[in-house]
Amino acid sequence: VIHVYLDDFRACPPGFVLARNLEECLLLLQEYEVDVLSLDYDLGWGFPNGLEVVRAMISLRAYPKRIFLHTSSDAGRKHMYEMLYQQKPDHVALVNGPVPPELLMELAHPAKE
């Protein structure tokens, strides 16, 4: 199980695998079991944005267990949230905001089994 952080600019939090663009994000969603996916909207000038990632996830039916939206774009967050809310399977948790600090700590320091 992995956790994916989609962002072209911000540093990747500990415990996450960084995806810088649509292609990397979709590859990880298709090849691995993803628990937490944290999405940015703006992914660089001239590159597919977070909404295009969401559209591709829906088309491919490639979902993580939990989705968070850490983007600073209010309009982008709104569009991604609305599309995901309407299309995601019931078992996928969707949060209209960033990963909470407590969960970031938990994912950065997983309990040893």
Report the location of each language-model feature:
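Catalytic phosphate/metal-binding cores of nucleic-acid and nucleotide-processing enzymes, i.e., regions
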Residues: V1-E113
